[in-house]
């Protein structure tokens, strides 16, 4: 006996909503997008032209597709014909893949995604899933949609640029020495700039034209032969100079694209070459990618941004600015790992924002070890006399204050140091263990007072029962979001190019992670 099956018979229900379960991902997508205020969609509205697909519908089908690990515009278009979820959300409409891709990369899409995150966070707070006490920040690297061999390195461009200028200067000196062109007033005696190179080519053109005219007017075979021989070298040099000018312009364009970065990809100029965690060949190969920063609570991504620099330290300040300006007011506690611990970041959070950083620094775990605490040659373990301002080394010698110094990093942040020097390191039995200075020189130490105070403050915060408990949640709060994104959602590489489009796609992927997590939560409840 078989169940009744007839392909030619009308099947009920015609209303697809009946087929969608109450806790289905499509319903959560629908509820989230419907909660976004109508004002957020006003920029899409146009009085003229063919009526457009409603942006609410387009956003719903994108979020639903991303939640099912479908990122391609063509595959999303196919889902609109195959998936009951997508048919219900689209209400029978079937936008083409071109329409889907154009909507995904629309200039208004970023603001719309911000509204998604804001509404989703408000819902979590309302349902008391999160308490807005702290945010947990971390970053991961996602590979860009670019060829891994399309690299341009800043050092190489600068090296070839210098070589090109030197070569052009030698050509100029040769032309002047042979009296082919007259000497020029250069801005700098030892070098030559692009404008001056163009002027040299113009003078060289004039000199070659004169030679051409002499050849045309001369009746003597020997004279014409002599002039042609004389003209040969200037023509070669002119060709080299023209090539140098074109290359100089290319190098300038490349440096302008690079800005403060050390590399970029020709396929996606916004992407920077960095080491990925997914290094299957174990050879440290650099790939073009973006540094994705997220802020989470309760394992939900509440804000995000993309950065071109591979290190997390320089991303914290601009990321906190983005959170405040586009998402929500910062809570009392900012929690992150040691990759974000720096004097500049501590100053920004404690002094400028008046908040509490629960961020370890590079040597924090090392300093907790018994071996480190018992090491007599670590300056952190040396006795300090606050009244007379000196340190005492393991040999009982005093290190007296000598002078103040200031160091600036490449970002322009200034750090102040107090330099102390030992009275006498000669004949010290511990010299080989304590001092790396040359024989005859005394041991010097540089103490950053502000940095030491900040480290003491962080140690106190992490030792406190309440704040220490909050910091311990970091690993189980922010890391699972990346695990879900890469392992479950299988989002390991962008499908679009350019930072603007990549940021939109990252927002769609993170919101898809949030919705799937929220679906699991509501199913348990």
Q: Which role does the model predict for each range below?
A:
Residues 22-63:
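Basic, short loop/linker segments at the boundary and entry of helix-turn-helix/winged-helix-like folds
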Residues 21, 49-57, 68, 72, ...:
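Generic, well-ordered alpha-helical segments
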Residues 2-4, 62, 69-82, 93-94, ...:
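Anion-binding and metal-coordination hotspots
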Residues 86-91:
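Secretory-pathway/luminal and periplasmic proteins that interact with or process carbohydrate-rich
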Residues 1-27:
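Hydrophobic alpha-helical membrane-insertion signals
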